[in-house]
């Protein structure tokens, strides 16, 4: 079983029709042994995006994506570890800290800074539909 940590930049591509959406969907559905995980931060970020942009973000689509992801509780240790991932923005640092804590096999992200920090931490990155996709 491959554990794939899904960050918000990737999850939003599953609810919006953007250039990488089809490639991401194809990649995530290509392997039956891939288990999607994320922290509860994903829930917050996606619902906030839907609230801020209701004309663009369908709440039912958000719920469907969240239903397909195993959401993991944040710990104090995650927040402390996130502080060591400078210069990442706080939410990205939290996502990286949780991905590392749960032993994710890969992180699915389209955030350039998070891509760099994840690779530096030894975590393989998936960004289907981009030049940086491995």
Labelled PLM ranges:
Residues 1-38, 52-60, 121-133:
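Short, well-structured N-terminal submotif of metal-dependent ribonuclease cores
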Residues 23, 45, 81, 116-117:
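Phosphate- and divalent-cation-binding pockets in alpha/beta enzyme and binding domains
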Residues 60-86:
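Acidic catalytic patch
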Residues 37-42, 46:
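Substrate-recognition element of Asp-dependent hydrolases with the DxDx(T/V) motif
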Residues 6, 37-38, 73, 90-93, ...:
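Short beta-strand scaffold positions
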Residues 2-3, 43, 68-72, 100-101, ...:
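Acidic, PIN/NYN-like endoribonuclease modules and their adjacent C-terminal/linker elements
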Residues 10-11, 42, 78, 95, ...:
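Alpha-helix capping/helix-boundary segments
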